[in-house]
Swiss-Prot record:
Catalytic machinery residues: D92, D274
Record has Cytoplasm as a keyword: no
Record note on quaternary structure: Monomer.
Signal sequence annotation: 1-16
Protein role: Chymosin is synthesized in the mucosa of the stomach. The enzyme hydrolyzes casein to paracasein.
Catalytic EC class: hydrolase
Protein name: Chymosin
Classification lineage: Eukaryota, Metazoa, Chordata, Craniata, Vertebrata
Database matches in InterPro entries: Aspartic_peptidase_A1 (IPR001461), Aspartic_peptidase_AS (IPR001969), Aspartic_peptidase_N (IPR012848), Pepsin_A (IPR034162), PEPTIDASE_A1 (IPR033121), Peptidase_aspartic_dom_sf (IPR021109)
Statement: the UniProt record of this protein carries the keyword Methyltransferase: no
E.C. no: 3.4.23.4
Disulfide bond sites: C105-C110, C265-C269, C308-C341
UniProt KW keywords: Aspartyl protease, Digestion, Disulfide bond, Hydrolase, Protease, Signal, Zymogen
Propeptide stretches in the record: 17-58
Length: 381
């Protein structure tokens, strides 16, 4: 079955039928933008890192820590409405809702970004339902509607979209993306909302019910491919991992080792593959073991710094997933900027779940297979 998945997806790519490629560009991370404006220290003191919680309560309020997007750098273009209005979005496999700022939003974050004007779209329909997503200490409030969304060569009609009427604080003001397009399972979406990729599958707008992500380390050539697997972005074979909970793209990690010794995830743990999170996030105790093993030291904001001159002598961290080893070298798990190096590992106090973000995805081409509920991983070029 797994070989058939690859053969069909690659065949679809070779035929060029209904294959959608969305170039992803690497922009300035929110962390750097806040730092340039002297706002990073205050932000880090106020925010807490964590995994998105379930949707619950009246109005279907979601909770997504704002720090999830602090280091996100890979964005793409979509178009909403008729005639189309252009937006830059973060394609996020860690959430399921699709939203953009609207003209009804007066928050600073909205004023600094493209805002959708439903009055100028002949295909917009107001659903009349509220949308609320909590981000850190604030929340995005909005309304749900239907409209046509165009993603590369796909025209997706009657797509539910959230139009923000309020965005939290001033943090989103400095983000390079306007909105978020969630690509997780529909069980994670708010009530009345259908994820974009689900709508595409239901309308048979994609050749195969899967999508794949390649994140180039330099930022050039990164690509989201809908409906196909592109072998030109990886070497060797894809290895498949069963999704354990059809909510996030969640699976089992067998262990995390350094020099053959288990340093984290002993006995196995759950992880999600998340394009909307840059770092590798795990339980604080496990992450602390890793930070100590790689020689990282904690700074006053709780982040971990690394001596840039030590990279060549630092150990490789290995994730074992479904019996396959996925090594991360120091150059993969370390962020280098303006002479400073920081660890790509981040601790979380309130969760046993891991998040494998861009640090991992840059090293391993990732396939998200909805038809078979599998994640495919191969060494990226």
């Amino acid at each position: 079955m797994r070989c058939l998945v690859v053969l069909l997806a690659v065949f679809a790519l070779s035929q060029g039928a209904e294959i959608t490629r969305i170039p992803l560009y690497k922009g300035k991370p929110l962390r750097k933008a806040l730092k340039e404006r002297g706002l990073l220290e205050d932000f880090l003191q106020k925010q807490q890192y964590g995994v998105s919680s379930e949707y619950s309560g009246f109005g279907e309020v979601a909770s997504v820590p704002l720090t999830n997007y602090l280091d996100s750098q890979y964005f793409g273009k979509i178009y909403l409405g008729t005639p189309p209005q252009e937006f830059t979005v973060l394609f996020d496999t860690g959430s399921s809702d699709f939203w953009v700022p609207s003209i009804y939003c007066k928050s600073n974050a909205c004023k600094n970004h493209q805002r959708f004007d439903p009055r100028k779209s002949s295909t917009f329909q107001n659903l009349g339902k509220p949308l609320s997503i909590r981000y850190g200490t604030g929340s995005m409030q909005g309304i749900l509607g239907y409209d046509t969304v165009t993603v590369s060569n796909i025209v997706d009609i009657q797509q539910t979209v959230g139009l923000s009427t309020q965005e939290p604080g001033d943090v989103f003001t400095y983000a390079e993306f306007d909105g978020i397009l969630g690509m997780a399972y529909p069980s994670l979406a708010s009530e009345y909302s259908v994820p974009v990729f689900d709508n595409m599958m239901d309308r048979r707008l994609v050749a195969q019910d899967l999508f794949s992500v390649y994140m180039d380390r330099s930022g050039q050539g990164s690509m989201l491919t809908l409906g196909a697997i592109d072998p030109s972005y990886y070497t060797g074979s894809l290895h498949w991992v069963p999704v354990t909970l059809q909510k996030y793209w969640q699976f089992t990690v067998d262990s995390v080792t350094i020099s053959g010794a288990v340093v984290a995830c002993e006995g196995g743990c759950q992880a999600i593959l998340d394009t909307g999170t840059s770092k590798l996030v795990g339980p604080s105790s496990d992450i602390l073991n890793i930070q100590q093993a790689i020689g990282a030291t904690q700074n006053q904001y709780g982040e971990f710094d690394i001596d840039c001159d030590s990279l060549s002598s630092m150990p490789t961290v290995v994730f074992e997933i479904n019996g396959k080893m996925y090594p991360l070298t120091p150059y993969a798990y370390t962020s280098q900027e303006e002479g400073f190096c920081t660890s790509g590992f981040q601790g979380e106090n309130h969760s046993h779940q891991w998040i494998l973000g861009d640090v991992f995805i840059r090293e391993y081409y990732s396939v998200f297979d909805r038809a078979n509920n599998l994640v495919g991983l191969a060494k990226a070029i």
